[in-house]
A protein has these predicted regions:
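Short hydrophobic/charged patches on amphipathic alpha-helices used for structural packing
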Residues: 1, 21, 66-69, 113-114
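Short beta-strand-centered segments that line the small-molecule binding cleft or hinge
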Residues: 1-52, 118-121, 138-141
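Hydrophobic hinge/microswitch elements
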Residues: 1-5, 11, 83-139
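Secondary-structure junction motif
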Residues: 11, 39-41, 46-97, 163-166, ...
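Beta-alpha-beta core module
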Residues: 16-27, 111-159
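Short hydrophobic segments within beta-strands
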Residues: 32, 78-80, 155
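A late-sequence structural motif
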Residues: 38, 139-181
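Short amphipathic alpha-helical segments
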Residues: 73-76, 101, 150-153
Length: 181
């Protein structure tokens, strides 16, 4: 609003603002669950491993997706704090499933939530981009819901001129992530 930031990233769906937006990439929100949780036995036909996510199996049309979060009604969750886009999405996903989640903890950083799931503290919503190494600490679940896909844009003021370095940055990052748009 005050034009103090040159560029930022944002994933607000259907923004109604006057900012210049360049779509960069999409990520997919998954439910990450510690391997030891019994829900994994119930949903074994939907469970994905870290290797599956690393090889982008979750993006394949034949990859099974949970139709609702209803089976997770008794699973404790680690949620992000209010104000975070993923918090808003998780609230909407729970509401659509008509469940009142068990919130074990709220944290401000997605990476913190991810590591707490690795430690067995609860389930969490994570980005598929976070799964960077093969491990057996958790299972992942693709969610069949429009809110489970986020488009990230580079955002800048439409009132300000884009400098050559800003344009070069946007072009560089756009070409790098183009396959993921």
């Amino acid at each position: 609003r005050e034009n103090k930031i040159d560029l930022t990233f944002n994933c607000i769906p259907n923004p109604k603002d006057n900012f210049r937006r360049t779509p960069i990439f999409k990520d997919n929100v998954l439910v990450a669950v510690p391997t030891s949780y019994p829900i994994n036995n119930t949903l074994k036909n939907y469970a994905l491993t870290a290797r599956d996510i690393m090889f982008r199996r979750n993006l394949m049309p034949d990859c099974p997706a949970i139709p609702s979060l209803a089976p997770f009604a008794d699973v404790p969750f680690i949620l992000l704090t209010k104000g975070n886009n993923l918090y808003s999405r998780s609230v909407a996903l729970f509401e659509d499933a008509k469940i009142d989640p068990i919130v074990r903890l709220q944290v401000s950083q997605l990476v913190t939530a991810y590591h707490l799931v690795c430690s067995g503290l609860g389930a969490a919503f994570i980005s598929d981009w976070m799964v960077l190494y093969d491990h057996d600490d958790m299972r992942y679940y693709k969610i069949a819901h429009p809110l489970a896909v986020r488009q990230f844009d580079v955002v800048s003021s439409s009132r300000n001129y884009l400098s050559k370095p800003q344009k070069a940055f946007i072009e560089s990052i756009s070409s790098y992530y183009h396959p993921y748009l």
